[in-house]
Amino acid sequence: MSWDWRFCSLVRLLLTFCLVTAFVQVVSAQDAVRSSDLKPGARLILKFPELPQSLYAMQSGKEATTQLYVALPENYSPDRKYPLFVFLYGGHGGPGAGPGRGREIMENKDCFFVNLPLFKKQIDADGPFKGLLISPENDGDVICKAYSAMFKKIYETIPNIDTRHNIIGGMSNGAHSVVTMFEHGDSYLMGLFQNLILIEGGFNYVKIFSRYQGKGMLYLYGDYAGQDDWTGRKMREDLPKFMKKFAESAATYHLDATGIVMANTGHDMPTRFNVDVMNWVLKQLAKS
């Protein structure tokens, strides 16, 4: 390998880094974003020193100011409105860094892509899944208060949000958080999102079905009962029966709910299912 080749590779790497970081505008909760900062592909980090630690920070022991991440689509225009596509990851949820799965699903178009961290009142090491499992009963208050503050800041920062078509989705513990918000949220939170996506989670927490009426719901779950699925063979084998009852309850309450069985999949959503989610989202966005 020649030194010229190495030098050229280093230059390309530095140029790529500069191009990417040039779009990132770090904004604290006290600052305001200028309209000139909102451009195609721009990235915003909003920080919230007044909010409690995220579940990621609690679990990792890393001291970090709670934050969220927003990515503007590549087809952004200040003359058009775009819905939020909020995505919540599973497990500890991460630190709220990076644009989130929504950007990948929508191929970086047509939405503001938001990555929120997860919140939990406290971690009980003796609890399910090493104490990380989110539940509406225990964590509803802290989740709703944190997300209310975060969404209000997003709306203060970005003027052209299409609230009528907002989407919020989550995987596993993230889906638990989405349902917790719907089960315990006030009228402000309930009015923000017309569409929700539940991936491998949240289904068993849906109790007040009337709160989901008039919303679009997409739920996905895997059918794989192999040993690599950490939820366990018994839980996976019982899931189709539970999901059948869930679908029946959704129909009874006249919910606009669509289910997708992810074939040969355990506790995951492989990228091959992105197109199914994108097509569903596009149908929701086309509604008046």
Identify the meaning behind each predicted range.
Residues R164-Q213:
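Primarily recognizes the serine-hydrolase "nucleophile elbow" in alpha/beta-hydrolase
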Residues V27-Y82, F246-E248, H254, K287-S288:
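A domain-start/cap signature at the N-terminus of enzymes
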Residues Y76-G127:
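Short substrate-entry loop that stabilizes the transition state in hydrolases
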Residues L13-A22:
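Bacterial N-terminal signal peptides
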Residues V86-L88, I199, M262:
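Alpha/beta-hydrolase
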